[in-house]
From Swiss-Prot:
Molecular functions per Gene Ontology: mechanosensitive monoatomic ion channel activity
Membrane topology, from the record: Multi-pass membrane protein
Subunit structure: Homopentamer.
Gene (UniProt): mscL
Assigned protein family: Belongs to the MscL family.
Subcellular location, record wording: Cell inner membrane
NCBIfam families per record: mscL, PRK00567.1-4
UniProt keyword list: Cell inner membrane, Cell membrane, Ion channel, Ion transport, Membrane, Transmembrane, Transmembrane helix, Transport
Taxonomic superkingdom: Bacteria
Protein name, UniProt field: Large-conductance mechanosensitive channel
Lineage of the species this protein comes from: Bacteria, Pseudomonadati, Pseudomonadota, Gammaproteobacteria, Pseudomonadales
Main localization of the protein described in the UniProt heading: membrane
Length: 139
């Protein structure tokens, strides 16, 4: 089997396609959460603590000199990233929790015993006949 045909077989498998879709949706969800945090959550929080824009919070370690930019610790952006992470982690946690609950409900549902196959029925009849023959008294 050639490399290209092996790759096709790998790429077409359901798990790989599902994983790729999950990664794409996850990246899009991350952008939505970043926008939500930066544009919806942080402005009111900044307003509550005195009109601070968290994106601008930084400590200058070395001032800019000519063409050399300043060296800064942009801890405001870090705070926003931490909040992004917490929201994404919480959303994933809630999703996994819901999936686990559905799996538990499926496991709890009683399953009917499987119906015996024709061979199993025939073997049972043979067993019963042999048992009946062995239980007869000897002449």
């Amino acid at each position: 089997m050639g490399v290209i045909s092996e790759f096709k077989a790998f790429a077409v498998k359901g798990n790989v396609v599902d994983m790729a879709v999950g990664i794409i949706i996850g990246a899009a969800f991350g952008k939505i959460v970043s926008s939500f945090v930066g544009d919806v959550v942080m402005p009111p929080i900044g307003l509550l603590i005195g009109g601070v824009d968290f994106g601008d919070l930084a400590i200058t370690l070395k001032a800019a000199q000519g063409d050399v930019p300043a060296v800064v610790l942009a801890y405001g952006k870090f705070i926003q990233s931490v909040i992004d992470f917490v929201i994404v982690a919480f959303a994933i946690f809630m999703g996994v929790k819901a999936i686990n609950r559905l799996k538990r409900e499926e496991a709890v549902a009683p399953s009917l015993p499987p119906t015996p196959t024709k061979e199993e029925v025939l073997l049972g009849e043979i067993r019963d006949l042999l048992k009946a023959q062995n239980d007869k008294p000897l002449p």
